[in-house]
Amino acid sequence: SYGYDEKGGVSVPGPMGPSGPRGLPGPPGPGPQGFQGPPGEPGEPGSGPMGPRGPPGPPGKNGDDGEAGKPGRPGERGPPGPQGARGLPGTAGLPGMKGHRGFSGLDGAKGDAGPAGPKGEPGSPGENGAPGQMGPRGLPGERGRPGASGPAGARGNDGATGAAGPPGPTGPAGPPGFPGAVGAKGEAGPQGARGSEGPQGVRGEPGPPGPAGAAGPAGNPGADGQPGAKGANGAPGIAGAPGFPGARGPSGPQGPSGPPGPKGNSGEPGAPGSKGDTGAKGEPGPTGIQGPPGPAGEEGKRGARGEPGPTGLPGPPGERGGPGSRGFPGADGVAGPKGPAGERGSPGPAGPKGSPGEAGRPGEAGLPGAKGLTGSPGSPGPDGKTGPPGPAGQDGRPGPPGPPGARGQAGVMGFPGPKGAAGEPGKAGERGVPGPPGAVGPAGKDGEAGAQGPPGPAGPAGERGEQGPAGPGFQGLPGPAGPPGEAGKPGEQGVPGDLGAPGPSGARGERGFPGERGVQGPPGPAGPRGNGSQGAPGLQGMPGERGAAGLPGPKGDRGDAGPKGADGAPGKDGVRGLTGPIGPPGPAGAPGDKGESGPSGPAGPTGARGAPGDRGEPGPPGPAGFAGPPGADGQPGAKGEPGDAGAKGDAGPPGPAGPTGPPGPIGNVGAPGPKGARGSAGPPGATGFPGAAGRVGPPGPSGNAGPPGPPGPVGKEGGKGPRGETGPAGRPGEVGPPGPPGPGEKGSPGADGPAGAPGTPGPQGISGQRGVVGLPGQRGERGFPGLPGPSGEPGKQGPSGSSGERGPPGPMGPPGLAGPPGESGREGAPGAEGSPGRDGSPGPKGDRGETGPGPPGAPGAPGAPGPVGPAGKNGDRGETGPAGPAGPAGPAGARGPAGPQGPRGDKGETGEQGDRGIKGHRGFSGLQGPAGPPGSPGEQGPSGASGPAGPRGPPGSAGSPGKDGLNGLPGPIGPPGPRGRTGDAGPVGPPGPPGPPG
């Protein structure tokens, strides 16, 4: 978007500043250590579409030929930019559930490719050539070699090769190494005097290429970084028009990488042991003192620039490796106390300067800038004094006026007359009082661009001024709050770290009542990492006797995840839960990979042209840039469209016809008058409210050519470049319009005089002066870019590469943010019927009953139903006694005490298994802990072999031809050429008619 400056003018956005260094990774959080799941099958390498062609570089000049003047020396090479700092580690996913399956073999980590060198210095701009037609599409570049692999891990057994799966997700880019030491900037040599230009000689043959300089030793490989989260696909950019290939700049040196950290000890897999209590958390150790930086390495000699090699074809994708065998399950270790943090080591000495990397491909063409505002016209200066009049000629005899004749042909240009003396310059008038500001007039038409003047002498580079005060604008009102964002996706499962040493086993206390959930405290400092070894598993005890059935205990801890049961019948869909409150913002994620370029969006509507603003103050001249190497010859441009015809002026009133006077002598040219005083600037307008961000409009018309900038300093003398290829011949120019007729009316024909004597041949005429170069016409509009051609067919798949070796497991990442509570699951199907239990032991033998009727006891209270006892043996039947008389009914007695509980009966048969209970709600995930300390970087493995180059795809169809480009601006007027040789004398003309008699 465009802003408004203090004077109400539209400010064009400046170029984007350089990216700041990336911060160091934060420490990992103290979250629980998750177990690693089985590794996914490796995806096939994707073959993404080739990005759009970069913007054209500026056309270079032809090298000096023959005995030409000395070329300027090339500018000094700037110091290499610092290497970016290591990126933040990506956030790890939620810890996985502890399973009974063993750890699977890890795939070897792919080494990071070395960082690309800094972009070379831009080439010096060549002469403005006309834009050429679009060239054929170049061959795809050679596929880069893969980076060094990680250290060789224990290789699992090769499994059977599975079917080719879909391509896997793109892995995150590893963090760049630590920045290398910046080399000292060499002192600039003295500026040599510019030699006089000699005559243009015959173009010489290109000399043999110089010997290549010794390449500096390569820097240490960068450490493998933490995997970062994949970034979202960027918005589709506007495809730039294809341009000419720019000159390849020198590559910067590669900075040294940090030393690899030590590899942690791996625990021996053992049998599952009992889970011990968690040890106490250790106090963090003191921070070590940072050591002094090491000395800077020597700068290698720069070798001669070699000829570019042919572009290779992309190699075939590698074959997908088979899955590794699963390892033995490891025992659940007990988390031990964390040791103190180690001291920070002093940085090592800077490595030797690496060999320069290849230059990166040019970026996409940026959007054309907005058309500049038309400046206010300057006030006309006062007229100069008129020179003294020349001597009046003698009046001729006026002839009879003849009829107006037809327009004659343009006569031969006569010899130029002598230049008159310059008139005296007039005195500058006094500056008048500034008048009131006038009303804003309508926007004037764009004036024609003037011819470019000759470059002035190089001025000294000015010092940078102090930063000006802040403008009088006020801060905009805050916008409305946006809608809440979507919940983040759960992160990927982290890699398991090394097992800690077992802590001391404490006595198990009684389980208390569950208390209320307290407020979460601030996260404590991250403790050091334990380094103990795995303990031996304990012996399995003998099964104990079965005890009596106890009372139901409190709800136990969540058990380990059991094996997956049979799929239950689908239940009814549950009601969707309420949306929870928005959680606290998580830590800043690592920068993602650059997304693929999307299709070009439709062109937006043409924006309205803004009102012309006040003329701004001229800014100070910027510092002179370094002189770049000469670029390649540009191709001739296409013919531009004819410009619009100018508007016809108003016809003036016809004046009276005056008598035809004799032509007077040529007067002296008056001196130009002084420049008028500059008007005072109007008051600044009020700052408006910030407008809404508009859509990107179509490219506006090209602006007028700006004034030439100050010339840069004379560069160092460079070597003679190779001879460029001869460009195609340009189109012939159009025939210019006929010149205006000469002054004066056509005279009446005179009478024929007598033939005179043949005259002698006249003296040889002098060569005419060089005519003034005419003003350039208005620049035509730029044509629309042609449609892109179809993409070529993909290359055939090459042979598979060798499978990589397994790398060491990386450190565990912090747990992810808490996700929303899940919906209740569907009711599962009833489980299978259980097996019948074992028969219980026989109960004790019952007492033998007494014979005879007992006395009627008081009715006791019903006791608790005891278990069914064993059937007693029948006693001997007693003799029947005489029946007594019936007594009176007594009152109801008091309730007797409960009788003793009978012996425990035999265990009954196992009943049918009950229905499976409804699945409970899923608990809330824990909050994310603070990031833990960065893990030690893994060792970089050897570089894999590059695959063979695939066949070249068929060429794409040619795109539709674009409109004719614009005519380039006229170059500066060159120095006067050598004086031509004297022409040969022409043949003697025929004798003239005789003259009049004397």
From Swiss-Prot:
Residues bearing glycans: K98, K919
Additional observations: These protein fragments were extracted from ancient femur bone collected at Rampart Cave in Arizona.
Native organism: Nothrotheriops shastensis (Shasta ground sloth)
Residue stretches of biased makeup (Gly residues): 318-327
Record's GO cellular component terms: extracellular region
Positions of modified residues (3-hydroxyproline): P698, P975, P990, P993, P996
Low complexity composition bias: residue spans: 9-22, 112-128, 146-164, 212-251, 371-397, 406-425, 484-493, 597-611, 624-651, 680-696, 725-734, 746-758, 889-903, 937-970
Modified residues (4-hydroxyproline): 25, 28, 30, 39, 42, 45, 59, 74, 80, 89, 95, 122, 125, 131, 140, 146, 167, 176, 179, 206, 209, 221, 227, 236, 242, 245, 260, 269, 272, 284, 293, 308, 314, 323, 329, 347, 356, 362, 368, 377, 380, 389, 398, 404, 416, 425, 434, 437, 455, 472, 478, 484, 490, 496, 502, 514, 523, 537, 543, 552, 570, 585, 591, 612, 618, 621, 630, 636, 654, 663, 672, 684, 690, 699, 708, 711, 732, 741, 749, 758, 776, 785, 788, 794, 809, 815, 821, 830, 836, 856, 859, 862, 934, 937, 955, 970, 976, 991, 994, 997
Classification via InterPro entries: Collagen, Collagen_Structural_Proteins
Function field: Type I collagen is a member of group I collagen (fibrillar forming collagen).
Name used for this protein in its record: Collagen alpha-1(I) chain
UniProt keyword list: Extinct organism protein, Extracellular matrix, Glycoprotein, Hydroxylation, Phosphoprotein, Secreted
Assembly and oligomerization: Trimers of one alpha 2(I) and two alpha 1(I) chains.
